Amino acid sequence: MALRAKADVWLARPWQCLPRTRALGTTAALAPNTLRPFEAIPQYSRNRWLKMLQILREEGQEGLHLEMHEAFRELGPIFRYSMGRTQVVSVMLPEDAEKLHQVESMHPRRMHLEPWVAHREHRGLSRGVFLLNGPEWRFNRLRLNPHVLSPKAVQKFVPMVDMVARDFLESLKKKVFQNARGSLTMDVQQSLFNYSIEASNFVLFGERLGLLGHDLSPASLTFIHALHSVFKTTPQLMFLPRSLTRWTSTRVWKEHFEAWDVISEYVNRCIRKVHQELRLGSPHTYSGIVAELMSQGALPLDAIRANSIELTAGSVDTTTFPLVMALFELARNPDVQQAVRQESLAAEASVAANPQRAMSDLPLLRAVLKETLRLYPVGGFLERILSSDLVLQNYHVPAGTLVLLYLYSMGRNPAVFPRPEHYLPQRWLERNGSFQHLTFGFGVRQCLGKRLAQVEMLLLLHHVLKSFRVETQEREDVRMVYRFVLAPSSSPLLTFRPVS
């Protein structure tokens, strides 16, 4: 099923039809042999005052990905602009991602996420790896990797995720069979949100929250609301100076801080419980990432708490939205869905015996996730502050420049992905390029929760699709909006019908 971006008609036009447009992906071959200076990079002029007004009116920058996509079409695969005193260079080709990776230092630097940092500073809390730079970042990251990202760690926590995914399936079956029509039509987004929290919390703290049932406790509802609030308020605060928003966005700052306070206190309670149970006797079986970190003394307690806060907040929306869009695209592409179902049914015995086999025995389903994230990259863009000079598209880019790599535009570039408007998971079964699937970043600073997110999505889809056909009447594309992560502006209605 072809995607047609109704919100912006220009997305459907040929790439060379606009004035000043260059053939993306071929510009490097057409560039002169002599190195060109930074000042020669095409400059993009943003209407700063209009953007500021939109943000102050709490519209945020919901169309940021589309604005940048249009800029690439007009200016080519590289352009620059100023963000306050910061020089920003935007790129969107795999070759530039590879160059960024090649010059990475031992301490790859990111921008400070001002609203999140402000909360930690005001509350006297440590920062985790998402907010750290420099040697402190490396110290934390090297001690977290073996417990969160390594194959050995994945082998330990996969059975926990599988248990939650199976419980989600049983909950869905119960809802379907209670319906007189023998099927269920629903907005599945909140259910998937609850699944992501349940699975992540179980893996982190070894504790189930009971979010897959009908009656949630007031404490659970407060916690869920806080997670939503953090991502809602972040883009309203991150694009303006704190000195301005402290006066113009007082209510938003208050909501942002209160949401983080709820999450922080929740994590503190979980850590206190894990600590007490470890003091009373070490568990005989694996009981989650935090218990492993504490029992092995891998990090100071403050660092464990700081990284647990970030993992708790960051492991929910980033899993939920790709799951929503994967189910939606499979519903719009029943032939692809049937092929995935056949694969899951064929692998059912091996995955049931060892859930980790899902990572190797379901190649088409893994391709579905890659194709979904090509079209709907949850992060939108990757960022690096250059530690040394670099040449991008034959332009000199000096050290200290902020470089943004836009995944949304890369995924829709026909020079990188032929027929980008088509949902074709099978393209990933034949591709070899390692810098084309970058949703989880690259290099030593790739997403810490990458493996956990992949396992959560893979097992959930495996269990649901082998038991249910997913259908929809909606044929129009879902409009995506930038809310710190790329999210659907509205969740499509999906019908779950038991496989006969």
Curated annotation (Swiss-Prot):
This enzyme's EC code(s): 1.14.15.5, 1.14.15.4
Organism: Mesocricetus auratus
Residues annotated as transit peptide in the record: 1-24
Induction: By low sodium intake.
Topology relative to the membrane: Peripheral membrane protein
Pathway: Steroid biosynthesis
Free-text tissue specificity from the UniProt record: Adrenal gland.
Subcellular location as annotated: Mitochondrion inner membrane
UniProt cross-references to PROSITE patterns, sorted A to Z: CYTOCHROME_P450 (PS00086)
Positions contributing to 21-hydroxyprogesterone binding: 381
Job of this protein: A cytochrome P450 monooxygenase that catalyzes the biosynthesis of aldosterone, the main mineralocorticoid in the human body responsible for salt and water homeostasis, thus involved in blood pressure regulation, arterial hypertension, and the development of heart failure.
MF (Gene Ontology): corticosterone 18-monooxygenase activity; heme binding; iron ion binding; steroid 11-beta-monooxygenase activity
Major localisation: mitochondrion
GO CC terms of this entry: mitochondrial inner membrane
Family designation: Belongs to the cytochrome P450 family.
Reactions catalysed, as given in the entry: a steroid + 2 reduced [adrenodoxin] + O2 + 2 H(+) = an 11beta-hydroxysteroid + 2 oxidized [adrenodoxin] + H2O; 21-hydroxyprogesterone + 2 reduced [adrenodoxin] + O2 + 2 H(+) = corticosterone + 2 oxidized [adrenodoxin] + H2O; corticosterone + 2 reduced [adrenodoxin] + O2 + 2 H(+) = 18-hydroxycorticosterone + 2 oxidized [adrenodoxin] + H2O; 18-hydroxycorticosterone + 2 reduced [adrenodoxin] + O2 + 2 H(+) = aldosterone + 2 oxidized [adrenodoxin] + 2 H2O
Keyword terms, alphabetized: Heme, Iron, Membrane, Metal-binding, Mitochondrion, Mitochondrion inner membrane, Monooxygenase, Oxidoreductase, Steroidogenesis, Transit peptide
Protein name in UniProt: Cytochrome P450 11B2, mitochondrial
PANTHER family linked to this entry: CYTOCHROME P450, CYTOCHROME P450 11B2, MITOCHONDRIAL
Alphabetized Gene3D superfamilies for the sequence: Cytochrome P450
